[in-house]
Amino acid sequence: LSRAFERTYSYLQGGTRFSKSSQALRWVLGLEVQNSDLQGKIIGRNESIDNGFTNVLPSANLRYQFNQGSNVSVNYRTSTRDPSLNELQPFVDNTDPLRTYAGNPNLTPQYQHSLSADFRRFDQFTFRNVYAYANVGYNRNQIVQSRVIDAQGRQTVMPVNLGDGWNGNAGVNLTNGSLGITAHA
């Protein structure tokens, strides 16, 4: 089985951002369009891959300065993760008979939404500092590695689009002079 493969990958992205600033408030709104196209041909076989994807990627950023030592920020952005050539190639790699890998030409890009917020307050006279943050992410068409183990203990691994998924974290950091406390979740 030959793994010879010819490919052409093109990627275009363009967009615009609008921003406004005042002494206390700064905001930015953005919108981008992304187009990617992967065309490939398996040498010696009559098989090809032709995947093209277009995505709209909005973004927003807001920062408010309460005073010189305190501010809050909120950020939203979107991004994509295109499948790699290795993930898309319809080949079975059986160099390790206990763990075979098969590409998946039907993968679609993963689309990610990220929302984050943080608050900062610092008193320059007492050196007290408060920093708190929270992040949440939503992924559509997550690309994950599917593993199937047969009765003899052999693994077959293949990338698949899992569907939707969420993730998040939050934390706070409090400092009073030289003493600090940090908590993350």
Language model segments and positions:
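Outer membrane beta-barrel strand-and-loop segments of large Gram-negative receptors
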Residues: 1-5, 102, 108, 127-185
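Surface-exposed extracellular loop regions of Gram-negative outer-membrane beta-barrel proteins
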Residues: 9-48, 53-63, 69-113, 136-154, 160
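Transmembrane beta-barrel strands of outer-membrane/channel proteins
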Residues: 1, 14, 29-35, 62, ...
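Transmembrane beta-barrel architecture of outer-membrane proteins
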Residues: 9-15, 53-59, 102, 112-116, ...
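Outer-membrane beta-barrel channels and translocator barrels
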Residues: 22-25, 65-69, 112, 122-126, ...
